[in-house]
Curated annotation (Swiss-Prot):
GO terms for biological process: protein localization to cilium. Its main location: cytoplasm. The modification Phosphoserine is found at S144. It is a peripheral membrane protein. Transmembrane segments: none annotated. The gene is king-tubby. This is Protein king tubby. It comes from the Eukaryota. Belongs to the TUB family. Signal peptide: none annotated.
């Protein structure tokens, strides 16, 4: 070989070895990737980068190759300088864009959360319409169960001509136990047994003391009894609640009663605490107990029958006439109460005290000095409706065998108590002197109880 040619080949080999040893050799693939591709592809190609040496060698066995996951992409330009800059800034741009996107989404979510209540608060209230009372009630909030009545309770309250009653003898209520001079059982005016001449009573003092105090003379207490039959066993053992009706649909809780399950005879517990209807409760006021046939009921206070200092007192006795022949008609009931003293207090009578007789024993012996006897007012037969009717003065709206009015034989126009149905589980109960709330409620409970020999 020519010496000069051999020398040139050695120089070329040395030059090639020097170029292979140079680190700038890796950048050559960028130029190769940036060349125009075939007609089936575009002028640019999607490349993927990662945090490491910038090796873009297209070998399928390259350990540095990162498969595409469509998470981030860059387009290469035709110049080598722009390719280098895009490759070096690829990760930082992707990270910044993701952080900005997350921050922007978070800021929008926070704006939505903060702006919604502001929008609601800033919206003015709509003007009052014709139903302004309803709108005002909505703004003030719903009242609790112990303060208001359901709309269904008052649905038939003022409906005239619907009640199964017929005006019979109507007389003005009187005070001090003296009946007006009138006659023939027919009133000369618009006042009735529950007329407007009396004032409606309100709760005075604590509930536990109020329910035991006799009603003042000349005061009428309008109450409502609600029967709760919801629950597992309340179909057989419902709970009864007594409320005093007030103006504007309000009411005040007075008493609650329930029938004891484990008892040989009907036995009702009465309490002024609606959450605890038991004998051991602090609000225990008394009980109602019947005989085996359900024809006689005795009302007791909360005293202990075995105590000598404060023995249990008899508050009332309710007797239902037996109906063994099964004649259809209204119930006949007799109510015996303790007599009243000159200062309008009950005479203390205790069947638990061996030194004296109870109310029932006094009545059986016709010893009427310290007891008062009441009877249900006799209904009038109406040929048009083919039913027995009484004038409840708009307080009773549905016919029921439980409806009754209690009067004294000396003045049948002075209605001491009346009770009747207004809906399936709602009843009205009005009482006057000499009854107290406990006595009236117990009399009403006796009307609910089943009676074997009376129906």
């Amino acid at each position: 070989m020519h010496p000069q040619l051999h020398k040139c080949r050695q120089l070329m080999d040395a030059y090639i070895r020097q170029k292979r040893a140079s680190p700038g050799m890796v950048q050559a693939s960028d130029l190769q990737m940036s060349r125009p591709m075939s007609g089936m592809r575009g002028n640019s190609r999607e490349l993927h980068a990662y945090d490491g040496p910038m090796q873009f060698i297209g070998s399928p066995h390259n350990p540095d190759q990162i498969l595409s996951n469509n998470s981030s992409s860059v387009h290469l330009s035709s110049s080598m300088n722009s390719s280098r800059n895009n490759s070096n800034n690829l990760r930082s741009l992707s990270t910044i864009n993701q952080e900005d996107l997350i921050e922007e989404i978070s800021s929008h979510e926070l704006e939505d959360e903060e702006s919604s209540p502001v929008t609601v608060v800033e919206n003015p209230l709509p003007p009052l319409s014709a139903n302004s009372a309803h709108s005002q009630r909505l703004r003030n909030g719903q009242q609790s169960f112990n303060e208001t009545l359901d709309e269904d309770d008052y649905a038939n309250r003022n409906i005239a001509g619907v009640a199964p009653v017929r005006p019979a003898g109507i007389a003005s209520p009187y005070k001090d136990g003296v009946a007006p001079e009138a006659s023939n059982g027919v009133a000369n005016g618009s006042n009735s047994g529950v007329g407007s001449a009396e004032s409606e009573g309100d709760v005075i003092g604590s509930i536990d003391l109020f329910v035991m105090q006799p009603a003042p003379q000349g005061v009428l207490y309008k109450c409502r009894i609600t029967r709760d039959r919801k629950g597992m066993d309340r179909g057989l053992f419902p709970i009864y609640y007594l409320h005093l009706e007030r103006d504007y649909g309000k009411k005040i809780f007075l008493l609650g009663g329930r029938k004891r399950k484990k008892s040989k005879t009907s036995n009702y517990i009465v309490s002024c605490d609606p959450t605890d209807l038991s004998r051991n409760a602090d609000g225990f006021c008394g009980k109602l107990r019947s005989n085996v046939f359900g024809t006689s009921f005795t009302v007791f206070d909360s005293g202990n029958k075995d105590s000598t200092e404060s023995p249990r007192l008899d508050l009332a006795v309710i007797i239902y006439d037996t109906n063994i022949l099964g004649f259809k008609g209204p119930r006949n009931m007799t109510v015996i109460l303790p007599g009243m003293t000159e200062d309008d207090q009950r005479v203390k009578i205790s069947s638990a005290d061996p030194k004296q007789q109870g109310i029932l024993d006094l009545w059986k012996m016709k010893n009427m000095d310290n007891i008062v006897e009441l009877h249900n007012k006799t209904p009038v037969w109406n040929d048009e409706t083919q039913s027995y009717v009484l004038n409840f003065h708009g307080r009773v709206t549905q016919a029921s065998v439980k409806n009754f009015q209690l009067v004294h034989d000396s003045d049948p126009e002075y209605i001491v108590m009346q009770f009747g149905r207004t809906s399936e589980d709602v009843f009205t109960m009005d009482y006057r002197y000499p009854l107290c709330a406990m006595q009236a409620f117990a009399i009403a409970l006796s009307s609910f109880d089943g009676k074997i020999a009376c129906e």
